[in-house]
């Protein structure tokens, strides 16, 4: 029972319409939820605006908050897997704080994988959404064909992802609290050979190479020790995956949000927290955490204010604070895990790092073993702080002509990060039989051979040193102004958009070439839409913009696209029925471009050279400058090396895209194709 007779019970379920029922001190309530059949009158976010879903002629896929929250991954990119047709994601790492997936729209459509990334806009501004809290996302729309992306010109060839954040709605304040606890585990761990098997295969390989039995890296005595496992310090057998890694790692994610407002003021505020732990075990003898971890704080505040009956001001602020922790010297830890030999070290023994002598088994390379690069080297802590600000002012101009409006938008983003390093060093203990190093010259098979263990100590336990590593500062701004027109004349609906935008990024490619030269874009956008009774639909889009990567006379281009649609079920000869609810055929064709050359910029600049540059062989082996000419002359000569050849004719990639599609709803919109 509920003592307050004015209490309201809110019932909701994914896929059904929510209901609010007054309790009135009743002991039992029966609630029947209606299926949430999406109306064709609903609007969908498109480039620089919204359109009714019924009149869309472009290829657009969408996913909402509920679907994203079904798989609460640390990175939103991993939640998109399997959610959107035509969108593929590839996750190359599970490292906490660095597990973002690469996203491709309709495959890799560029010369390089790096150049095939789609353009990502959050609330209409180019930003990363990888570390956003899914609780603050209203929808993610993916624009796939030329009709939907032509307005982005030189940046639309690989598709566009539009992320829209949540905003407040008129009504009482609603407080939402969510908490998720989960585990992460590797999809598959390699099966590795034990010491005896590894040594046996190595002996077999040496015999195949013609090595005599008395010259084999592993003697019969060595093989017997591996087989019996009776000398685990000198002849260890370690599965490094099992030794260093846990089966699973814990991830927690929490969020609290509040939204509501009045007719004139609406608000949405969200606070999120995420902690992602790594898979590695804490090793003995260390006074710091040797595991990977990532802590993230998300915050967002969106405010909509009706200044007058015709003027609306929208303000948005968001931020992400991240703290990523990585063991020092562990950049290639997964490669080292795979390469590390089971007999390279017994691991940490009584709080001491013990490693096998590198020459114990002649011819066996034991460099780059994981215990050497992972234990005792300290850690790196990367702190990042990202903030975004948006301001949008829209003015209804119905007093001039019905359906006319103007909109002005400005945005500012700032990103700052730095790395703090904590470095240390620990003693290394190398085990020997006593008679191996006492100068007796005895063979291990001799009865007087002393097999008691002694250790040779190298290095020293050093106090931790602290330093600051790489710093990154970036900022950018974006401005946009548009005139919009939407009006209905009887059964005819017309719409138009004329938009100007400009942006500039400072320190965009740090630390790559030309990182200190800002990146700038400027462009014009046009759109015309028409439909008759939502049955016959036509749309024309055009983008005129350019890229500073190319020569001035090849910097700007025009990118047009057109599309048509025909809703067959609106015809009178198809009676209304529950089997085929909606059927639309659509087609589009358009020209789009791609100027994403990864880290390469200003490809039109004259040829460049470097003087007295080191050849990589000299760098690797002798650290000498210049080059050697001839076989007998060993003196390094000053020389010039080509760096980049300029090409004033190079321009963006272009793609002429065609798209044909059918939208069909069956069984009262329960099945959608």
Regions found by a protein language model. Name each.
Residues 68, 116-117, 252, 302-311, ...:
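Extracellular/periplasmic, surface-exposed regions of secreted and cell-surface proteins
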Residues 213-239, 253, 334-368:
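Acidic, glycine-rich flexible loop segments
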